[in-house]
């Protein structure tokens, strides 16, 4: 576990000061990782961090800011009959951890639709079903994201402002 006051060069590159147009987010919160936007890639990253023993033991602090008021994935492309263009095995977690509770198949199981999905002739979900899966996973990660946050600036912190009592020769 790294000491909370020690910052490596890589840490300093990822420590950011965020100013938001909303006052619901602290103006000067410090994170090890701050994600701007909360689409499928950042959703998958936030899940991976939550499930990471190493990140949890190191008290790795991450958060994500999303401009929209809720999770959405290409809402304009939810056309009737449209199908996902990739394998559902490329969901948010399966390639990293097939036993994760955030998998597409766990989503189907928890909604009582796994058997029906497996028995379908076509093993590719509709875009509507995939969107529902992503939203389900995002709701389970609500504490990792602040919605309705319009980020207006990002400024790197200096070593002195990130850890005033740290030695300047850390870099």
Please provide the spans of the model-predicted regions.
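A short, basic/flexible loop-to-alpha-helix module at the beginning of a structural domain
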Residues: 8-31, 54
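Glycine-rich active-site loop/strand segments that organize a redox cofactor
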Residues: 9-18, 61, 65-131
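N-terminal Rossmann-like FAD-binding beta1-loop-alpha1 element of flavoenzymes
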Residues: 26-63
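Short, solvent-exposed loop/turn segments at secondary-structure junctions
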Residues: 40-41, 69-71, 152
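Rossmann-like flavin
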Residues: 66-71, 134, 142, 159
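Helical element adjacent to the flavin cofactor pocket in flavoenzyme catalytic cores
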Residues: 128-145, 151
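A conserved short coil-to-beta-strand element within the FAD-binding core of flavoproteins
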Residues: 147-170
């Amino acid at each position: 576990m790294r000491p909370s006051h020690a910052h490596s060069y890589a840490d300093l590159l990822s420590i950011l000061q965020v100013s938001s147009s909303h006052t619901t987010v602290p103006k000067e919160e410090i994170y090890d990782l701050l994600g701007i936007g909360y689409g499928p890639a950042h959703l998958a990253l936030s899940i991976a961090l939550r499930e990471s023993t190493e990140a949890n033991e190191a008290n790795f602090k991450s958060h994500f800011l999303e401009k929209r008021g809720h999770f959405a994935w290409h809402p304009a492309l939810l056309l009737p009959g449209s199908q996902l263009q990739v394998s559902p095995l490329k969901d948010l977690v399966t390639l990293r951890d097939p036993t994760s509770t955030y998998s597409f198949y766990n989503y189907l199981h928890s909604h009582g639709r796994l058997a029906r999905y497996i028995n379908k002739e076509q093993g590719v979900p509709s875009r509507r079903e995939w969107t529902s899966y992503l939203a389900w996973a995002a709701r389970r990660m609500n504490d990792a994201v602040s919605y309705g946050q319009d980020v207006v600036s990002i400024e790197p912190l200096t070593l002195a402002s990130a850890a005033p009592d740290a030695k300047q020769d850390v870099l």
